[in-house]
C-alpha cells in the first residue's frame, strides 16, 4: 500500500482539483449545501451497497464519491468563512482523542461493549449533561436503524432486559395484539401495533447481537437472486411470468433454493 506521504500528496491533489472545479465549472460553482444533500444520501447508500457486496473496486470508487461530498461541504463552508477542511480534521481528531481515553488516557476498557458504554458517558459530558439521552439519535435516520439506535442508547443507561430471553414473550405479545387489530379491520391501530412488532423484533436482534439492517438486506438480496432466477427461467422458456401459476413459480423458486441462491 501507499506511504503516508503519498496519501497526503494524493489528498492535497484532490483538494486542488476541487478548488479548480469550484472556480471554473458552472455546475460545481452552482452547488450549495441544500442542493448537494440529496446526492450525499444517494452516494452513502451506494457505498453501503458496495460494502454489502464486498466489492473492493466499487468500495474504492464509492469512498471517493463520499469523500468528495465531505470536502465539498467544507469548501462551501470555507467560502462563507464558517469552516474549512483543517477545522473538520482538527475537530474530528479532538473528538476521537476525547472519546478514546482507554487509548490516549488512563481509562481501562477491555471490551468493545465497555468502550461503547464509555462513549455514551463521554458524549453526555460533551453536551454538559444537559441533553436528553435520546436527543443524539438523528431524526433523519431510516426508521429501522433509528429504532436500533434508540434501544442501544437506552441500554447504555441501564434501561434494558435483565434476561434477553424474556424478549420473546414481548415479541409474541406484540404479534398477538397486531393480529387482533387486523381482525378488527382498524387500519390505523393495526399499523401502530405492527410498529410495536417491528420494534420488539429489532430489540431481539440487538439483544442477540444481530444487526437488523444487515439481516434484512441479506434477505432482500436473497429474494432478488431467487426472483431473478425465476424470471430468467421463464425468459429462456419463452414464457411470460404472468402466465405461470403460483404452483409453477413455487417449483422454480425451490430450484433456486436448492442451488443455494
Task: For every predicted segment, state its role.
Residues 1-62, 68-194, 198-261:
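Flexible "arm" and connector segments at domain edges
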Amino acid at each position: 500500500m501507499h506511504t503516508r506521504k503519498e496519501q497526503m500528496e494524493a489528498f492535497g491533489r484532490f483538494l486542488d482539483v476541487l478548488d479548480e472545479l469550484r472556480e471554473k465549472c458552472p455546475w460545481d460553482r452552482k452547488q450549495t449545501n441544500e442542493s448537494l444533500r440529496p446526492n450525499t444520501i444517494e452516494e452513502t447508500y451506494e457505498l453501503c451497497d458496495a460494502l454489502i457486496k464486498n466489492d473492493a473496486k466499487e468500495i474504492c470508487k464509492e469512498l471517493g464519491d463520499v469523500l468528495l461530498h465531505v470536502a465539498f461541504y467544507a469548501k462551501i463552508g470555507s467560502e462563507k468563512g464558517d469552516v474549512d477542511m483543517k477545522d473538520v480534521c482538527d475537530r474530528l481528531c479532538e473528538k476521537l482523542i476525547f472519546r478514546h481515553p482507554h487509548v490516549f488516557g488512563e481509562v481501562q476498557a477491555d471490551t468493545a461493549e465497555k468502550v461503547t458504554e464509555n462513549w455514551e458517558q463521554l458524549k453526555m459530558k460533551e453536551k454538559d449533561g444537559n441533553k436528553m439521552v435520546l436527543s443524539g439519535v438523528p431524526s433523519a435516520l431510516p426508521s429501522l436503524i433509528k429504532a436500533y439506535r434508540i434501544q442501544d442508547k437506552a441500554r447504555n443507561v441501564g434501561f434494558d432486559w435483565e434476561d434477553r430471553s424474556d424478549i420473546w414473550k414481548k415479541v409474541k405479545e406484540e404479534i398477538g395484539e397486531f393480529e387482533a387489530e387486523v381482525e378488527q379491520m382498524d387500519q390505523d391501530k393495526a399499523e401502530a401495533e405492527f410498529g410495536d412488532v417491528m420494534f420488539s423484533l429489532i430489540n431481539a436482534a440487538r439483544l442477540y447481537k444481530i444487526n437488523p439492517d444487515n439481516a434484512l438486506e441479506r434477505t432482500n438480496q436473497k429474494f432478488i437472486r431467487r426472483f431473478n432466477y425465476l424470471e430468467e427461467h421463464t425468459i429462456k422458456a419463452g414464457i411470460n411470468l404472468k402466465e405461470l401459476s403460483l404452483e409453477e413459480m413455487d417449483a422454480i423458486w425451490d430450484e433456486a433454493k436448492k442451488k443455494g441462491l
